[in-house]
Amino acid sequence: MRIISRQIVLLFSGFWGLAMGAFPSSVQIGGLFIRNTDQEYTAFRLAIFLHNTSPNASEAPFNLVPHVDNIETANSFAVTNAFCSQYSRGVFAIFGLYDKRSVHTLTSFCSALHISLITPSFPTEGESQFVLQLRPSLRGALLSLLDHYEWNCFVFLYDTDRGYSILQAIMEKAGQNGWHVSAICVENFNDVSYRQLLEELDRRQEKKFVIDCEIERLQNILEQIVSVGKHVKGYHYIIANLGFKDISLERFIHGGANVTGFQLVDFNTPMVIKLMDRWKKLDQREYPGSETPPKYTSALTYDGVLVMAETFRSLRRQKIDISRRGNAGDCLANPAAPWGQGIDMERTLKQVRIQGLTGNVQFDHYGRRVNYTMDVFELKSTGPRKVGYWNDMDKLVLIQDVPTLGNDTAAIENRTVVVTTIMESPYVMYKKNHEMFEGNDKYEGYCVDLASEIAKHIGIKYKIAIVPDGKYGARDADTKIWNGMVGELVYGKAEIAIAPLTITLVREEVIDFSKPFMSLGISIMIKKPQKSKPGVFSFLDPLAYEIWMCIVFAYIGVSVVLFLVSRFSPYEWHTEEPEDGKEGPSDQPPNEFGIFNSLWFSLGAFMQQGCDISPRSLSGRIVGGVWWFFTLIIISSYTANLAAFLTVERMVSPIESAEDLAKQTEIAYGTLDSGSTKEFFRRSKIAVYEKMWTYMRSAEPSVFTRTTAEGVARVRKSKGKFAFLLESTMNEYIEQRKPCDTMKVGGNLDSKGYGVATPKGSSLGNAVNLAVLKLNEPGLLDKLKNKWWYDKGECGSGGGDSKDKTSALSLSNVAGVFYILVGGLGLAMLVALIEFCYKSRAEAKRMKLTFSEAIRNKARLSITGSVGENGRVLTPDCPKAVHAGTAIRQSSGLAVIASDLP
């Protein structure tokens, strides 16, 4: 039964083969793939698989059987061997890719053996009968675009990988229209060469570029353009490539440069959408390259399989017998033995017209694409956007740009904006228990609060990202690459920078800044000097040494003048006549103001204690009055200053200004290694700052620090031998943090501001700027600063421990007063002892007593107040007989009480 069934099938196949011109059920096709074409090979396999598994028998009455070889184009023998291998297998047509090294070998074999080659590679310059070019030519579209932009001076960057067809067309047009074109071959350029070239072109004010390179080299050129910051507003790039959406242009979106290009594949057509659904389901391990959308070369590969399948269907309908290709033979035979049906195959291929992924696929007599349409795209803030199209009939047709409704941030409302910042207290810090939080909740600080307020005003979602290298942003002098937060913006890794980022000219050239949210200047930080210990006689500090000397001389002078006027004025003399019935002179001295009483009067008035005597004459009272007025002013001034001098412990700073730093050598000083402060000194033309920059640049060890925290730590550990130059806001903040051992000295060296940064030309720029202005008007920015600088300060308003401790007096503040008191008491006792001994000696001589007996009598008198047997007080110095009566008036400060003596 099985044998009968097989015979029936064979018989039916034979009749079917006779009816259809003996067309084979399995069609052998070749595939030649070069390096870095994994995705194209995946598209090739997928197209064959979908054809062979098509449920429509009329669409796929035969199977395509591929024979694939991977070739190394640098080895011409390997290319020849691969082609001959395909030929010996009896393939009817070959799908293959080539480069400039293998194109001539493959096209020569195809022409000699009449084997058709369907290729998505760049179009050949000559006429190759058996080569079908799937890739359309860009010449017409590019020239139309240049005419539209009216470019007459631009740079044309090209390589020779794709030949010289576009270069030749541009140079011919330039000659006709008088264009000035700088054509530069970049085939052998490396990264450094690219950057040097771009810098040179920038010096020549070249802002317009046409780039005609294959995708790998093109991507590298674009990266170097970004690295040197030439992807910002003012630059315009036309990319001569058919896969505008295949190119990574995210960084150009943030930069703001105008980028124009061409797109062959329309991802909105039903056929492409259907294929994309199938493409996404491919196993990435089995189908390499399927993790990304198909490139235009992959779409051309897919269309190439469709062209071959349609060709074989057409041959089948025409009943052309291709079942026997003849003797495969040796492809290197001399003379060559071409395939007899090769002409039919080539003719049918060129007659094919299908709708593929790349639109209408049709060829002319030379195997080149005709009647195709390519879209023109421009890079907008929202990404690539179609602005027109080009075809052979209509040429360049531009679509009127539809204005974007809503605010500038409408395009980003549905995604999260990356906000780059730097870990710097008090701007951005980790919370104490940050491990318990995720995302933005891990951080706190001034800039964290500011970011939240800005996001509320412009209505966006954001994610805080700490800059990896911990730098603010500077441009490397050698590589021309930006680092830090500026680099994050320039190279498209972030969209907003909210940090203590200084607004400078060099930064403004590559990024945009908002209005300043904080004003500041460069200041000097030093280690806080030890507070000077108050001197023993610190109570003398309120008045200068010269004033004290003048007071002493004034005191002596006033006393002498008072003595003299009292001597010369008759009203100071008190000579009185004896009363009636009394004899002898009065006990009252003739003049009270002797030299010692004058000194005593002046001292009492100066001490504001007064005296028992006072001038009676007008001249004496004038002297006393002016002396009292003088002492009133001096004592009041002294008292007013005394409190401040006793309660404030002064610090003597070795540095008070930048000039002090520049003219000394003991104290080193430096800045952050990357930032605006260093740039300020590097560019300054002021002599003092130039001198400081010369020192900092050549100092060993280096005085530049990687972070602000490192600089502060160096100040604290240097024992006063290192000064750190940084922004005044940070200086003031650190001064308020424990251990409270740093201080700001002198004024600010310049005036500048911190701004919120966005990429050049970003749609966020205007919205962020308005948000900062709105926050500033009600004083919210000042409120935020007070919150993080002073409300959370740890050193008090004066930078010390607290107000109470600062105003409290210690013993050292008034020790001198106690010393004077003790000294005065000691001096008084010493004088009393001298007087005691002197009087005892005089008493011994007068009373004919020994000195020791006189001492004992005086001591007994001093202790008991009596030396007599019955307790009477003996006063040997008093007169023996005194008139009885009432107490005699005081004279010369001595009062004597007279009483009846026995």
Curated annotation (Swiss-Prot):
<feature type="intramembrane region" description="Helical; Pore-forming">
    <location>
        <begin position="593"/>
        <end position="608"/>
    </location>
</feature>
<dbReference type="GO" id="GO:0030425">
    <property type="term" value="C:dendrite"/>
</dbReference>
<dbReference type="Pfam" id="PF10613">
    <property type="entry name" value="Lig_chan-Glu_bd"/>
</dbReference>
<dbReference type="GO" id="GO:0005886">
    <property type="term" value="C:plasma membrane"/>
</dbReference>
<keyword id="KW-0812">Transmembrane</keyword>
<feature type="binding site">
    <location>
        <position position="677"/>
    </location>
    <ligand>
        <name>L-glutamate</name>
    </ligand>
</feature>
<keyword id="KW-0813">Transport</keyword>
<dbReference type="Pfam" id="PF01094">
    <property type="entry name" value="ANF_receptor"/>
</dbReference>
<feature type="topological domain" description="Cytoplasmic">
    <location>
        <begin position="566"/>
        <end position="592"/>
    </location>
</feature>
<feature type="topological domain" description="Extracellular">
    <location>
        <begin position="639"/>
        <end position="813"/>
    </location>
</feature>
<dbReference type="InterPro" id="IPR028082">
    <property type="entry name" value="Peripla_BP_I"/>
</dbReference>
<keyword id="KW-0449">Lipoprotein</keyword>
<dbReference type="GO" id="GO:0004971">
    <property type="term" value="F:AMPA glutamate receptor activity"/>
</dbReference>
<keyword id="KW-0628">Postsynaptic cell membrane</keyword>
<keyword id="KW-0732">Signal</keyword>
<dbReference type="InterPro" id="IPR001828">
    <property type="entry name" value="ANF_lig-bd_rcpt"/>
</dbReference>
<keyword id="KW-0406">Ion transport</keyword>
<dbReference type="InterPro" id="IPR001508">
    <property type="entry name" value="Iono_Glu_rcpt_met"/>
</dbReference>
<feature type="transmembrane region" description="Helical">
    <location>
        <begin position="618"/>
        <end position="638"/>
    </location>
</feature>
<keyword id="KW-0597">Phosphoprotein</keyword>
<dbReference type="GO" id="GO:0032983">
    <property type="term" value="C:kainate selective glutamate receptor complex"/>
</dbReference>
<dbReference type="GO" id="GO:0045211">
    <property type="term" value="C:postsynaptic membrane"/>
</dbReference>
<keyword id="KW-0770">Synapse</keyword>
<comment type="function">
    <text>Ionotropic glutamate receptor that functions as a ligand-gated cation channel, gated by L-glutamate and glutamatergic agonists such as alpha-amino-3-hydroxy-5-methyl-4-isoxazolepropionic acid (AMPA), quisqualic acid, and kainic acid. L-glutamate acts as an excitatory neurotransmitter at many synapses in the central nervous system and plays an important role in fast excitatory synaptic transmission.</text>
</comment>
<feature type="topological domain" description="Cytoplasmic">
    <location>
        <begin position="612"/>
        <end position="617"/>
    </location>
</feature>
<dbReference type="Pfam" id="PF00060">
    <property type="entry name" value="Lig_chan"/>
</dbReference>
<feature type="glycosylation site" description="N-linked (GlcNAc...) asparagine">
    <location>
        <position position="56"/>
    </location>
</feature>
<comment type="subunit">
    <text>Homotetramer or heterotetramer of pore-forming glutamate receptor subunits. Tetramers may be formed by the dimerization of dimers. Interacts with EPB41L1 via its C-terminus. Isoform 3 interacts with PICK1. Found in a complex with GRIA1, GRIA2, GRIA3, CNIH2, CNIH3, CACNG2, CACNG3, CACNG4, CACNG5, CACNG7 and CACNG8. Interacts with CACNG5 and PRKCG. Found in a complex with GRIA1, GRIA2, GRIA3, DLG4, CACNG8 and CNIH2.</text>
</comment>
<feature type="lipid moiety-binding region" description="S-palmitoyl cysteine">
    <location>
        <position position="837"/>
    </location>
</feature>
<feature type="transmembrane region" description="Helical">
    <location>
        <begin position="545"/>
        <end position="565"/>
    </location>
</feature>
<feature type="disulfide bond">
    <location>
        <begin position="740"/>
        <end position="795"/>
    </location>
</feature>
<feature type="topological domain" description="Extracellular">
    <location>
        <begin position="22"/>
        <end position="544"/>
    </location>
</feature>
<keyword id="KW-1071">Ligand-gated ion channel</keyword>
<feature type="modified residue" description="Phosphoserine; by PKC/PRKCG">
    <location>
        <position position="862"/>
    </location>
</feature>
<feature type="signal peptide">
    <location>
        <begin position="1"/>
        <end position="20"/>
    </location>
</feature>
<feature type="transmembrane region" description="Helical; Name=M4">
    <location>
        <begin position="814"/>
        <end position="834"/>
    </location>
</feature>
<protein>
    <recommendedName>
        <fullName>Glutamate receptor 4</fullName>
    </recommendedName>
</protein>
<feature type="binding site">
    <location>
        <position position="502"/>
    </location>
    <ligand>
        <name>L-glutamate</name>
    </ligand>
</feature>
<feature type="glycosylation site" description="N-linked (GlcNAc...) asparagine">
    <location>
        <position position="371"/>
    </location>
</feature>
<feature type="glycosylation site" description="N-linked (GlcNAc...) asparagine">
    <location>
        <position position="52"/>
    </location>
</feature>
<feature type="intramembrane region">
    <location>
        <begin position="609"/>
        <end position="611"/>
    </location>
</feature>
<keyword id="KW-0325">Glycoprotein</keyword>
